[in-house]
């Protein structure tokens, strides 16, 4: 049996909490290549030793409970237990630590983000001995990565399907997000697509409401896609939101989209759930549909610095579960996102191999072992004046999505789309000529205004619009 431990009362927690550190705090442990590694930002209750808290996190997220039980003797805890193998004080924070925990791979079902999260971010987050707990990062070993399908297609296959290379893709979320009839909604999509955008998008809360049922929306949007394609000679798409009350209904909507011949559908992966998302990603891979992922609800989970789950973990989970696009913030728009932190998890979404880099919040080296990449989507409060910064920050393998920044154009949707496309092409050309967009971006946009009245009108409307607030979640 595992060694019995003394139950004692201590400051900050009630009698009956045992000393986890005797079994689960192992600073001499040598990490295995197959271990799943977690970095937790941990704030103990006053009087609780950090070693005890780190061990408690390891125990309660793996094999442990609050007392020794006789059935411990029926298995090998040394083989299956999580281990807190390192503690690191957080600079500038009193009584806060990064606890590093190693989990044996055998604790987790193959190919299941749901099972992975149920253990690692489960009941332990309500543990009384902890004032706060946040999962900052996960290292997914190659042996576990290979049990997942990952993105249905990935960045390169998407570009091949769309026949679009050498620039970011352009999108637009249709507004108002709720209340339009299906026919008017389809017309708004058509105007944006014929104006030069690659995609339009359902808002995350557009499902199948009384004012616009899903089947009607799918039909009118498909008409908009095909009409704009025939006029422009470019492949177009619209993120048809297949999120539904049940998995069965979700897959029915996906099947109807395939029947219509549209190239891409959409899912709200956090509100819809990882099980549903993985099922939908498998359907998309089998049926040639691209899958756009919205992160609605993420800020409830990731925005607080001391408690919850950092978005880089949610992004890794999405890459495992499956998605071709994922919203990732803008750095410069209306939504939360520090530059270096954002670039850190954008690389984790797109690249094959990412080195540990604490300056960008990357706690572990991550090898995706040739799993397809996820295209980051920059969306939220952006307009034409942001185009140079967005092009410079996100690079070519990204989708820049302007909702109000397209539909708010004084001349209408199509001129708004023209303005965005002209601004993007001007920025890409300037970058390819070797110009510094960070320094010369505004000059590039002003020069393009001289031969694009649509862009000039957009620049005039949004010349004073800025979202300059301090980021809450900093390194």
UniProtKB/Swiss-Prot annotation:
Keywords: Acetylation, Calvin cycle, Carbon dioxide fixation, Chloroplast, Disulfide bond, Lyase, Magnesium, Metal-binding, Methylation, Monooxygenase, Oxidoreductase, Photorespiration, Photosynthesis, Plastid. The modification N6,N6,N6-trimethyllysine is found at residue 14. The modification N6-carboxylysine is found at residue 201. Binds 1 Mg(2+) ion per subunit. The modification N-acetylproline is found at residue 3. RuBisCO catalyzes two reactions: the carboxylation of D-ribulose 1,5-bisphosphate, the primary event in carbon dioxide fixation, as well as the oxidative fragmentation of the pentose substrate in the photorespiration process. Both reactions occur simultaneously and in competition at the same active site. This is Ribulose bisphosphate carboxylase large chain. It comes from Mesostigma viride. The lineage of its organism: Eukaryota, Viridiplantae, Streptophyta, Mesostigmatophyceae, Mesostigmatales. The gene is rbcL.
């Amino acid at each position: 049996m595992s060694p019995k431990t003394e139950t004692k009362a201590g400051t900050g927690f009630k009698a009956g909490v045992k000393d986890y550190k005797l079994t689960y705090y192992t600073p001499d442990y040598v990490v295995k290549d197959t271990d799943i590694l977690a970095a937790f930002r941990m704030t103990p209750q006053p009087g609780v030793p950090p070693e005890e808290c780190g061990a408690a996190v390891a125990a309660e997220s793996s094999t442990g409970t609050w007392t020794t039980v006789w059935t411990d003797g029926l298995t090998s805890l040394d083989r299956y237990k999580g281990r807190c193998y390192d503690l690191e004080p957080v600079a500038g924070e009193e009584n806060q630590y990064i606890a590093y925990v190693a989990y044996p791979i055998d604790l987790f079902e193959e190919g299941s983000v749901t099972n992975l999260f149920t253990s690692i971010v489960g009941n332990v987050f309500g543990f009384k001995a902890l004032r706060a707990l946040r999962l900052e990062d996960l290292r997914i070993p190659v042996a576990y990565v290979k049990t997942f399908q990952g993105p249905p297609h990935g960045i390169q296959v998407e570009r091949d399907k769309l026949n679009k290379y050498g620039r970011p893709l352009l999108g637009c979320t249709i507004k108002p997000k709720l209340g339009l009839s299906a026919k008017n909604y389809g017309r708004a999509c058509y105007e944006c697509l014929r104006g030069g955008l690659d995609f339009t998008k359902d808002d995350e809360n557009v499902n199948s409401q009384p004012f616009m049922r899903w089947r009607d929306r799918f039909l009118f949007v498909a008409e908009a896609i095909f009409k704009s394609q025939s006029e422009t000679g470019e492949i177009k798409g619209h993120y048809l939101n297949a999120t539904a009350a049940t998995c069965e209904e979700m897959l029915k909507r996906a099947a109807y989209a395939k029947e219509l011949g549209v190239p891409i559908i959409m899912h709200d992966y956090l509100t819809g759930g990882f099980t549903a998302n993985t099922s939908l990603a498998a359907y998309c891979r089998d049926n040639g549909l691209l899958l756009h992922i919205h992160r609605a609800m993420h800020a409830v989970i990731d925005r607080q610095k001391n408690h919850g789950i950092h978005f880089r973990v949610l992004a890794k989970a999405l890459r495992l579960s499956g998605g071709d696009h994922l919203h990732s913030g803008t750095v410069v728009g209306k939504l939360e996102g520090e530059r270096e932190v954002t670039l850190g998890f954008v690389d984790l979404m797109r690249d094959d191999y990412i080195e540990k880099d604490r300056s960008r919040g990357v706690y572990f080296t991550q090898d995706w072992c040739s799993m397809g990449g996820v295209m980051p989507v920059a969306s939220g409060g952006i307009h034409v004046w942001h185009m140079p910064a967005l092009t410079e920050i996100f690079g070519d393998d990204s989708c820049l999505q302007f909702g109000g920044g397209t539909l708010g154009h004084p001349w209408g949707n199509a001129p708004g789309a023209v303005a965005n496309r002209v601004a993007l092409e001007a920025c890409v050309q300037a970058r390819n000529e070797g110009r510094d967009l960070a320094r010369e971006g505004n000059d590039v946009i002003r020069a393009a205004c001289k031969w694009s009245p649509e862009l000039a009108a957009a620049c005039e409307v949004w010349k004073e619009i800025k979202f300059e607030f301090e980021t809450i979640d900093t390194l």
